[in-house]
Structures are given as structure tokens and as C-alpha cells.
């Protein structure tokens, strides 16, 4: 008998047995009571931080979920627990919290039951929750009190799993949920995971993987899920938890999910990641900070069906890759009015990377990116992407970069390919992002001011809308597009004219063109604005901002003014830490060195650091580049745990390519195995080359 036929026979036997038990009264009555409980909609108050299902003196979160799901009946509770259950007055069941003051951390050792019915899990009901007291100045995010985490030393893949429509998760701190990454045959780990019932789908339903989503009609994605006012990956005291979660919110298969006013930080992977379906997704007013530390590096990663998705009003800062990365999506998304700053800390990647068509990137502030601003891929075909009214500054690349000629190297999928030549063939329409719409060209390299006005003229693709931008930095020949100062249209011959106001001598301008049929262009070559006498004062440099993602709330009383220093400040700080042979973890001695560095960084918030990983020359170049990167990552994670803002720390690996010395002794190799800290600040920093944490391998040691 084949395995498939045997399974079918066994299933039929089980079904017959269940029918016989039903006929002769052999089934327990608990499921009947449970279904009655579901139909009546319950309000359950969690008053115990334990993780058990038993009749005792306290009602646990695990019991509360089972009660609202209908898998646990009220009559199985103790007399002390029953008063915690009542009929809900709202449209759905509700799980509230009244935990003892010193017992607000719920530690679970196994997966909690799926949220299989409409329910509100409301951590704001816990005594002491202060909704009107924001923890940071940037967004109205109140600190939660109730914490949900995995028991220390255990792998629990998910904090809460949503498989039902109309589920709300509110006011919780959820962290420490990850999995054994050596095992690939598991559902994705996350603080909150949203999918249809029984994820993942039973892939035995089909023998050969299909090109479409491997789901049947009964795999219905949950609708109208709301995730709000939670802190994911971060504790209520704003510290990094001992175990970091894999992902924040994984929208595996859902429609109409809203993620708003959450602080999502410190994850190994992305803060928000989608997979099969996430149409009508709304991600708004969240602080997405310091994610991607050991896995998927992007703050928000959108894949699958993302039609009508919106990413609006978020602070996206200090993440290891892109702020927002769209990977081969179906449907169009809006990325609007976000602060996308200080990203690309581990991978030098675009702040926003677009694949696909008809996306809109508008009104964003994109700054301090270790890569370009917005990149549009050439493959898969990507066009009609509108990129307008954004403000760019402090980039390592173009404000807008359209990848051309089907360039598909790793570099192209991270940083683009820099400025394109003008379109010289109809084939460029086929192999370039946004169908190779040409960047505008000014008719002159400089324009004469009349007072504070200048008439700017140029040429662009006919019929396109041209936006003119002020350029406040002198880093690139094309942009950055700092501030929009006007817009006009190109006529049928491609000519455009704009009288721009409010300009000063020595300022520069650039431009972009947008055609609804093709999308937005790369920036024009900058032009200078000057007076007729050619006296052009140098532009005033923009002062450097303190590199921080979040700040404490604004004080009610004005701070005492700080008297500026009249003499340069000299700081003494170590510039390197060392590692053992073939290791990437921080030794106890190296930790003491990093503690000294962290103290200096805490006392001097203007300093930013590049962490450069190095190895000795043994092993292959590729292996050593990876080892150097892992050492830099370990150093960065240690400093973040000491409270250093991730926006201040970038990493780079040189592997064996920059040795300390050319010798081949054990001492030489020990000096090579290091992370160098490159400090950047306007003040005078005296760096100390220290060797107190050198780790020399034993004689005869091998890798």
C-alpha cells in the first residue's frame, strides 16, 4: 500500500471512530461549552504572570487565549479564576490585564495558542499605564507595562500568532522570540505573526510547487488586524533584551492589516516583513529603529502582493540596510511623509529600493544614508514610479538612481549604478528603471540673479513635469535634492522655464522630471546661481546634526544654556579591540575596552564611529571578509547594548586586506585580528592603540 493511500485509510478510520463516539455519547462536553463561550464573547482578565493551564489561584495569558478561542471552558477554572471571566460588551472578545505590580513579565516556554477568533488583547488596561506620557519626542509612544517574552534559554518562535479577522494587539512589550536558525523547515519566527489558520500551509496538498501562492481557497488570510501602541523588540525601560527577536511583525498572509504607533527595534531581521499577501497594509506613525542586526537588514521589507500598501509618517532610523526595500512585489505601494535617516549601518544600501511599477515615494526626508536615496531597479521591469517632493541630504550616492541596461549585480540591487547617460536608443526604455526617462538639462551652468530671483531654463522629456530643487551640499555634481523651490512643465519641444524666488548668490539648483507614463528621472547636473558681477560667496555649510534616532520628550522647563567651549576638547579613547583565532565574540577583556569606548560615546553624542573588521591572512579572502564583518557586527551589538544609538555606528569589513604588519608570528596575527574604530567628529580626538586584549593563539595553533 502506498504511503498516500495508507494516510487516507487511517484518516477514514479516525473519522469513523469519531462518528461512533458521537453517536454513543463518548465525546467530552468541553468542546460544546467552549463553543458556547465563543458565541457569548468573553472578557478575560489576566492576573497571573505564570505560563500554565490549570485550576489554581491565577488566570494566565495562555488560559485567557484558550478561553476566548473556545478550547477551554469556564467550568474548568478554579473558583478563584472564574471571577476573572465575564461577558464582553464590545463587538469582540477582550483580554485585559491586572497583574501584580512586581509581576508584569509573562515568560512563555512554548508557543501560545493562535488567536483564532476576533479579540482585543489590551495591555493598556494594566494599572499604571500612562497613555498621555510619551517616551520619546518624535512620536506619541507611551511605555507599556506588560511584557511578553520567551523563557530564558528556550527557543519560542512567535510571541502572538494571528489567524482570525478583527484581532487587535495593543499596549504590550513583546521581545525575545526567535528560533533555532539551523532548522529551515519552520514557519517564520516573529514577535507577531499574521497568517491564515494552521501556518504554514500543508505543502503535501500539491506534489510540485506552483508558480502561484501554494494556498487553497480555504487558506483565507485574516482581515482587519490592528497592531498598535506596542513596543516590539524593546523593553519598557528602552533597553535591549538579552535575547533579540528574529522579526517584529511578519505579515505572512493577510489583508487590511494596520501597524501604527509602535516602537519596533533591535531585531535580528526586519521590523516589518511581508510574504505572500499584505494588500491594503498600513504602516503608520511607528518608530522603526535599529533593526536587521543579524539577518534581513532592511527596516521594512515588502514582498508578495502589497497592492495599496501605505508606509506613512514613520521614523525609520538606524537600521542595518534600506529603510524600505520592495522585493519583486505585486501591486503598488505609497511611501509618504516618513523620516528615513541614518540607515545602511551594516549594508551600504539605498534608503528606499523599488522593484515593480506605480509606486509613489513622496514627501519623505531621506538623510544620512550610507548609500543613495531612492533606487529603481531595471530588472524586474520597474516603471511609472513617482518620486517627488522629497528632501535629501548627506547621502553616499544619488538622490534618485535609475538602474540601467539590465544591471543585476549585487551592487546594483543595493546601491544602484550612479548617473545614467542620456537615452540613446529605444532599448533603454526596456532595460532601465522608470523606462529611462531623461534627467533635465539646464541651458547654462550658471544663472544670474535679479535680486533674489533667477530665471531657470532647460530641457526635459516633452510633456514632463519638472521640479526644481535647492542644493545645500557640495558633495555631488547631481544633487542632493535638498528642498523643492518650484515646478513647471516642459512643452512639446521639451523646453521649460521657471522664475525661482528666494535664492542667494552661491546657491546651486538641480531638477527632476516626472512623466506619468514612465515615472521620475534622476537629478540634473547642478547649476550655480550668482550675481552679475560674478562675486560668488561660498555657500554656508549646513551644521551637522547630533546623530540620534530618538530623543527624550521635550522638557516643560527650558534647559540651562550650555556655555560653548572656547578651546578644543581632547578625547582619549581606544581605537581597536582584538579577537581570538577564528572567533567573532567579545572576550571579557575586550568588553572592558568597549565599556570605556561606550562611556566616551555616551558623553559625546556628536561622535559617529565606523567599525572596520579585520583578520589575519590565513584562510580565503571570502572567508576573512565574512569573519571581519561578523567581528564588526559583534562590536556594534555590544555598543548598542550599552545604550549607544545605532544611528552612530556603521560597519565595514576589510578581511585580511589591511594588516597591521607583514610578519607571520603569532603576535603579528593576534594584532591583525581586530576591529578598528574610526571616529568622526569636529573636535580633536586622540586615539589610543591598545593591546591589553590581545589574544595570541597557543603555539602550533591552526584555524
Regions of interest found by a model, annotated:
Residues 615-687:
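Periplasmic OmpA-like peptidoglycan-binding domain that tethers envelope proteins to the cell wall
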Residues 121, 168-170, 226-228, 257-260, ...:
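All-beta strand scaffolds that present successive hydrophobic residues in beta-strands
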Residues 156-158, 178-185, 236-247, 268-274, ...:
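Short glycine/acidic-rich loop motifs that flank beta-strands on beta-rich extracellular proteins
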Residues 572, 579-613, 640, 677, ...:
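Periplasmic peptidoglycan-binding/anchoring modules of Gram-negative envelope and division proteins
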Residues 96, 122, 147-149, 161, ...:
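Extracellular beta-strand solenoid repeats
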Residues 26-223, 244, 367-369, 378, ...:
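N-terminal, post-signal-peptide segments of secreted/periplasmic proteins
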Residues 515-521:
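Short acidic/polar inter-strand loop motif in beta-rich domains
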